[in-house]
Curated annotation (Swiss-Prot):
It catalyses: chorismate = 4-hydroxybenzoate + pyruvate. Belongs to the UbiC family. Pathway: Cofactor biosynthesis; ubiquinone biosynthesis. Monomer. Transmembrane segments: none annotated. One of its GO terms (biological process) is pyruvate biosynthetic process. This is Chorismate pyruvate-lyase. Removes the pyruvyl group from chorismate, with concomitant aromatization of the ring, to provide 4-hydroxybenzoate (4HB) for the ubiquinone pathway.
Length: 168
């Protein structure tokens, strides 16, 4: 696992609205309201997480992500590769204001190889403000502002070429 400054997620071109030419089967994946981990599990024998970067960062390091999150002195950053049957399917980047990491949710800094979805969707205190669709060259991406017990976190997901999203 790295703590370097380079994000595993390259710049994404975010769409203001859902693209009109978005195929229905791809839209179904991108607009998934449940756990992407659970959805991936329907397409493989085993899902596992490879953590790439886990550390606290400053607001200056957020770039345009700062527009989506409240002001905080520090943010927990977690970048991972999610694999299905040992094939990289998704790059994930989670940015969590330090204030969200209170009480039992402090456990978010210790997820290690546990998929984020297992933690977030394990209870009934999760809501989603929005899903925004984007492209990174030929790859589809999405980001969601989620609230855990009313406290925000920003999740960005890039679907890699081997992802079942593309095998429709």
């Amino acid at each position: 696992m790295s703590t370097s400054d380079a994000s595993i997620i390259k710049p994404i071109q975010w769409c203001a609205i859902e693209p009109p030419n978005l195929p229905a089967a791809i839209a179904d994946w991108l607009m998934e309201l449940g756990s992407m981990t659970r959805r991936f599990e329907l397409h493989c024998q085993q899902v596992h997480v490879e953590p790439q970067r886990e550390c606290f960062i400053s607001r200056d390091e957020l770039g345009e992500e700062a527009e989506h999150l409240p002001i905080s002195e520090r943010y927990w950053l977690r970048e991972i590769v999610l694999c299905g049957d040992n094939q990289p399917w998704l790059l994930g980047r989670t940015v969590i204001p330090e204030g969200t990491l209170s009480g039992p949710d402090r456990a978010l800094v210790d997820l290690g190889t546990l998929p984020l979805g297992r933690y977030l969707f394990g209870g009934n205190n999760l809501t989603r403000d929005y899903i925004q669709v984007g492209r990174q060259d030929e790859l589809w991406a999405r980001r969601s502002l989620l609230r855990l017990s009313g406290k925000p976190l920003l999740l960005t997901e890039v679907f890699l070429p081997a992802s079942p999203l593309y095998s429709i």
